[in-house]
Amino acid sequence: MSTSTQNIPWYRHLNRAQWRAFSAAWLGYLLDGFDFVLIALVLTEVQSEFGLTTVQAASLISAAFISRWFGGLLLGAMGDRYGRRLAMVSSIILFSVGTLACGFAPGYTTMFIARLVIGMGMAGEYGSSATYVIESWPKHLRNKASGFLISGFSVGAVVAAQVYSLVVPVWGWRALFFIGILPIIFALWLRKNIPEAEDWKEKHAGKAPVRTMVDILYRGEHRIINILMTFVAAAALWFCFAGNLQNAAIVAGLGLLCAVIFISFMVQSSGKRWPTGVMLMLVVLFAFLYSWPIQALLPTYLKTELAYDPHTVANVLFFSGFGAAVGCCVGGFLGDWLGTRKAYVCSLLASQILIIPVFAIGGTNVWVLGLLLFFQQMLGQGIAGILPKLIGGYFDTAQRAAGLGFTYNVGALGGALAPILGALIAQRLDLGTALASLSFSLTFVVILLIGLDMPSRVQRWLRPEALRTHDAIDDKPFSGAVPLGSGKGAFVKTKS
């Protein structure tokens, strides 16, 4: 950024087309958050109407996780081959079909399939929309682009909680899904006329189509084996999250099988840069493991241990969700000021100061608890708004949408595991202590993984010939690309 532009407010560096593109993508993220909270809120009504068991009802939430990894891969590859815009439109169409099908669903099977479709749309939304917005904004604003965009998820969660209390008592649970289709239509209209991302256009101008992750896995020499492994992974995830398996050893074995399959896909598609991809999946996995126990079980904690009534629970959840939304935006500013990794680490360290007081204060003073949750979620959950920027920087433009979509949505399986871990620990401790200890300990794992730049470090250890020394999005150096103590002079920009 030149000296002459430093005095211009950041928002004036963006033109109308860039803001329109951002709005179209942000609405998609709002719908993601809206749907996540929506299915949890109406679960008891759906269970009662369809006569479902508790396991069947819970599987409707898990269904989205079962299909997300494949949606991230498929729609991400579409974005790499045909452009980010087409993948964004396809994602929102999948979302629309799934949402409408939920509203019209006559029974469990139809709704389960609809949730699978929604999961694919959600995954494509994350990979394509995040990549599109980040690549469309100027390099010095790309942490803001990422953070502002992800704030839509938290806003959607807050909106869903408020709409639920107004709509369901009068019109029933199906009306919520029909209401959810309105912003989808608006987002689709916005996306129809947005320009293609600048980075993608520059990369593909006058060049032959790239070989995408889908081409490598499903059209290459190992395509038959990979197709079989895809079905095996889907079946294993179904049994893990919806199959009512009581044997922990079997569940662990199936989980390990899925991990082997996903790592195999990453090794095949990333070539010599597979260590980076595998470490990024671990980063996302632990990011979900530290944050989602609170996301999923906070309402239960407020109802059971603090004995709050539904109105008070809604108020506290508003503080939590709004804090996360604000934190995404704050994280964007911090990331552009301090750098992505340094901002991430500083924010998580600050959040650690608040996590114990949140669950130690009790329920006597609702407003103090709400404020503590606001700031803890702002610092601990909100900083995840720049996670797409962090992940995307490790991938070249030609592979970024699929790389981001696949690594994030495989790691997002931690969101399905996190509530289970919290509930298991709560069998020996009270729920508040379980949530605090789980979040506190696992946050340090993420701090180490990001702070030490382990994706670059492990790449340097295992396959140094394919090491990327600079962020592909903003050209800033990767600290893990050189040995400790080598100094800034050791950074020599390399192509990958």
Curated annotation (Swiss-Prot):
It catalyses: N-acetylneuraminate(in) + H(+)(in) = N-acetylneuraminate(out) + H(+)(out). This is Sialic acid transporter NanT. PROSITE patterns: MFS (PS50850). InterPro entries: MFS (IPR011701), MFS_dom (IPR020846), MFS_trans_sf (IPR036259), SA_transporter (IPR004742). It is found in: Cell inner membrane. It comes from the Bacteria. It holds the Pfam family MFS_1. CDD domains: MFS_SV2_like. Catalyzes the proton-dependent transport of sialic acid. GO terms for cellular component: plasma membrane. Keywords: Cell inner membrane, Cell membrane, Membrane, Sugar transport, Transmembrane, Transmembrane helix, Transport. Belongs to the major facilitator superfamily. Sialate:H(+) symporter (SHS) (TC 2.A.1.12) family. One of its GO terms (molecular function) is carboxylic acid transmembrane transporter activity. The keyword Iron does not apply. The chain crosses the membrane at residues 22-42, 58-78, 86-106, 116-136, 148-168, 170-190, 224-244, 247-267, 278-298, 313-333, 353-373, 378-398, 406-426, 431-451. SUPFAM superfamilies: MFS general substrate transporter.
